[in-house]
Each structure stands twice: as structure tokens, then as C-alpha cells.
């Protein structure tokens, strides 16, 4: 069987595509995305709409292989057709002005013609059925709903039908045993951000949880967040599976932010963020709590601006330990795919980046920080080469003094201890980088960048091991890559 979201009002029907699935035309909706990677520190008001553009999407539910026919209405079918992730190996035919292909795996896909502008999201979801609506605390059936800020309590559940469009956001504090599931969409466009802090309750984003445990989030789509999209502050035992984060464009819209938490898994999810995609942070309020035991796997990640798989920049915690990013496709890495920014006091160790596939495209333009009202994005003719790995420990509080920090976070690790902002026992292995012909000609194998910097003389970096880096299928040696080190012992970084 297959089905699809059919919202009951005229919500952004696409003028760029017609889509047919197994011979049936289905509705194609639109969402807003960033037009180019141009971000800034919160200026007191939201990002201008003229820095954005529309993308299209279809939201499918299926348990069978699907034949998909896409008819482009604003671009030529004769252009360069890309179906991502490339690792899926989807073969494309062109028939009668249509792009024809099949998909059988659940997950998020992206169709691009020539570049990323005017792309099409294709979400193929596993069916999630609510057998008894009477047993669900908050049931959103077919239709459009306006709950505003949905405040959950312990043992609450939320179900979102595939035909439900919910204008609102989710909040919980000191709660446990919560389940949020379904194939519909939460849209946070009704929320206005009015202040700087991302850590506080003032602005919610799609989901914000404080001091919660035993949480399940399955299958739901989240769009148009006012700030960080999915927020977990000091949470324990959280399972996130097969969610879709998309249509994000506002300032600081990170995808998933996990703060001083433990026992977290994120699987089979699609995360397209404007800012960082997945990041693990530590902040003063919870600086006594380490970040431990986290697994991010089988995900499709797309970061417009910032970092993709990130530790930091805020690392106010005793330790980061046993954190794994594994078997993920990175459609766009922002400026860095695998990132450790130990900007505070934590000892970061036993972190693994494994079996990641990083796509570099010559139409990805450089990330720029907007510093004034008059500044425009003027780097549309340049190429951004995202770093495969970056490890550094520049001081967060020095870089962001405007936040008013006056001291280092409380921690068992004092300044001057070799563990303070230290990094050790890091594995980066089996990283498969794809680059297009333009990048290959201009940069060669030097498009693969490893950057390891220690800015604190009393701090130790050691046992950072990189093994199995491939470019377009060819394994690279250390001399093939652009390897940059500063302030680290010669044996701190080993490339195998």
C-alpha cells in the first residue's frame, strides 16, 4: 500500500513540480528554506524573507516499492538530475518530460535539477497507525489544527495523522514516559522569536524538553521553527526515530540540539537545518552533568550553514563520552562534516565518526556571517569546500562575550589541568567523500580537509585516529589530503 498527506486547505501548493506515484497524481506542497548560507547573531528581529525561497515536498506513507514520476514545471527535464542521497544509487530515466525513478527504502530523499535551488523533498515514511484514539492524550486527526504551545505532562501521548497539519509546538519539563508519533507535520510558523537566548523558555522551537526522561519521538515532520528545532535539555533515555526536520530558514535553526544529557538515540531521520544539523552541547545550568552514551545512525543530514555532526561549541560539562555518529549521508555539510569545538571545560573522549558519506558540490557557496544591515550575500560565484574533520578549542566565552559570562563554568576540571578542554581517543573512520567534476579539477584530492588545532598550551590532545578516507571511491593517504595542525604533539593525530 501507499498513501500520502492530503491537507484540507490550500497550503502552499507547488508551482515547480507535479508528482505521480504508482500512476496517481498526488499533492505537492511548499515550504520556505534559506536561499543562501547567510547567518548572523540574533539582531533583535527575525531573518528577512528576501533571504529565502520556496522548496517543494511530498509526504508519502508506504510499505511497498514506489514508481515516482516528477514533472518539472520551472526547470528543464534536460538539466542535471540528482537524486540524493547518492549512496542509494537511484537510477533515473527521462520519459515524456518527466523524471522517472523508483524508491523502496523508507527515508528522506531530495531531487535537485542543476543545483539546490527549487529542490523537491520526497519523504517516504513507514506507516504509523493509532489503533485507539481514545487512549491518546492529544490526538490530531485529519485537518488543520491550532493548539499553540502544547504543554505535555508525564505519561502523555501525541498522535499526528498523516493528513494533519498542526500549527504549534511542544514543550515539557520534569516529565517522563512521553510518546510523540505519527506521519503528519508540526509547523511552528505561528511562533515569533523576540530575544537572544536559545537555552531559555522564551522561544520554544518545534520541541523543547527540560529535565525529562523516557521519551519517544517517531515519524513526525517538523518545519518552520522559530529557533533550535528539537531541543533536549538535561534529558535521559530519549529515542528519536524516523522524524523529518525540513523547511528551516530562521536564525539559529539548528536541527537537533542535545544539552547535558545521557542515553540518547537518533535513527533513520532526515534533518535539513539552516544552522547546525546535530549538535551536543553543555551549558552552565547543567555543567555538573556529562554528555554520555549517544548514538546517531542511519540518518540523512543537510546543514546549510555551520556544522553537521558537532560537539560544542558550548561544552560546559565534566565529560563527553561514548558519542557515535554512524552510517549517515551528509548531503551538505555546511563548513564542517565532523566537528569537535571544545569551547569550554569538558574532557571530550571516546567519540566516533564512522561510515559517513559526505557530498561536496561546486554549487555549494561559502557560509557567511552577516555583520551589518547593509551587508549583502556576495559570494554566489565561489565554492565552499566543507572540512571533513575539525577539532579545536577556542574559548566560547571569549568569542561570545556579549552573552555576559564572567567566569568559567563550574567543573571538576580546573583551568591548567591537561584534561581541561582536552580531546583524546577520537576515531574518524571509513569516511566516503564525493565531489563533482568541477571540484575534482580545481582542488584534486586537497578538497579533503582535516583541521586539528589546540589553542591552550596546558591542554592535551592525543589519540585522534583517522583511518579509511575515500574520495570518489579511492582511498587517500595523508599526503593526498589537506591536513592542518597547530598546537598539537606530532603523534596526537594519526592518519592510517
Where are these regions (language model features)?
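Extracellular beta-rich repeat passengers
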Residues: 336-496
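Short tyrosine-centred short linear motifs in exposed loops/low-complexity segments
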Residues: 64, 105-109, 213, 226, ...
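Aromatic- and glycine-enriched pocket-lining scaffold segments that form the walls
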Residues: 5, 18-22, 28, 219-220, ...
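Beta-strand-enriched, solvent-exposed domains that form extended recognition/catalytic surfaces
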Residues: 2-134
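Right-handed parallel beta-helix
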Residues: 155-157, 162, 176-187, 213-224, ...
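Extracellular beta-strand-rich solenoid/capping regions of secreted or surface-exposed proteins
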Residues: 99-103, 145-157, 165-181, 189-215, ...
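An acidic-aromatic substrate-binding cleft motif
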Residues: 126-150
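Short glycine/acidic-rich loop motifs that flank beta-strands on beta-rich extracellular proteins
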Residues: 147-150, 167-171, 189-194, 226-232, ...
